[in-house]
Amino acid sequence: MEEVTLVITSCGRFDLLKRTLDSFFEKNTYPIKKIIITEDSTEGKKLENLISQYENKYNFCLIINETREGKLKSIDKAYNEVDTEYIFHCEDDWEFLKEGFIEKSMKLLKEEPKLLTVGLRSKKDFKEDFFMKEEYVSKDGERFYEVNEEIYTYNPGLRRKSDHDLFGSHEKLKDKLYEMELSKFYKDRNYRTIYFKEKYVEHIGDKRHVHFSRKGKNSILDFKIDRMVKKIRYTFLKLFGKVK
């Protein structure tokens, strides 16, 4: 059986991270060799306290940034620790809804070497022109939505470590629109991305986006103030049913 590492990028939203982990553990049905979590808030103790609820059941590797370094450096640190053929990449603000997403994704990646990843979000989350008009058809006849241009995403999805290694470090993208740059890189090499027609995940981080300035100092105090304000606003919006 092919081995899979779960990589999660986190930054101080521990309530959302707990929902992400709980739903993943409930819905995932494929063995995970190791779970790597990078924490960019510098609040390692809080992460360790959360993970202590699970550590006797799963093999965790926690990477705590001593200063805020941002998503790209965090991804590089995590992927440097991966020793499996496949990576299930995730962020700290997703809820998993259905079982079988890793097995089904792996089957598709095995049958098509140029398939970059299989998306799990609903088609309704995207603009009308995000997907091609012509659908992707697998070898067993199942139909999927195929992405038009933005084929690279940090949203939840299974991917090959070898495909990541083609590009290398993501930190070199720090002054660019990184998902667009990565999409162009892989599209130029004839990669494709498809999405299931059924929804497997729900984004739960609306209104809780983590601020990281590409040019600013990104102090811990600024981060904590920004996090507090967004969490208060999110709590009120959730109370009135405006967010999930």
Where would I find each of the regions flagged by the language model?
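Cell-envelope/extracellular polymer assembly enzymes that use nucleotide-activated donors
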Residues: 3-5, 34
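Short, well-formed alpha-helical segments that are part of the catalytic scaffolds
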Residues: 13-28
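C-terminal catalytic/acceptor-binding lobe
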Residues: 19, 149-152, 156-162, 166-244
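Acidic donor-binding segment of Leloir-type glycosyltransferases
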Residues: 24-63
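Short beta-strand-to-loop acidic/aromatic patch adjacent to the donor-nucleotide binding site
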Residues: 85-95
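Conserved donor-nucleotide/metal-binding helix-loop-beta segment in metal-dependent transferases, i.e.
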Residues: 99-117
